[in-house]
């Protein structure tokens, strides 16, 4: 399979509409998973930083979403544990992008250090190798709900635009 690994600005993928079957995002976060090994991470943490990170994560997802093919899978991952950056953003992706969260109750059942959250899984530091992680999977169930124009930011499709069949 073809693989692209990048840390480019996600807007760089705008020309690749529907190109990818799977997109794995490890988005910048407030870094709560780093608290055990980095005292500075603890000192820099704040509710304002969590809000800033959650907003940044949504922009990243909104920018890459059009490049995910209908039926494609988005893996959303952070190294933090707060609900705003994890299940809160997964819920936002589901509601705003029309994505279907993919959860299997028995997928990771019984694995030490893995906790099922509302919409994903948390790997608990100290119980798994590494500093911990939160991960969710979502399926893109339809064509892009966002309309992009050269003159402005993305906007949500209207019901009329969504219902309209593409011209042949």
Label the model's feature ranges.
Residues 101-129:
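Class I S-adenosyl-L-methionine
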Residues 73-78:
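Conserved beta-strand signature within the Rossmann-like core of class I S-adenosyl-L-methionine
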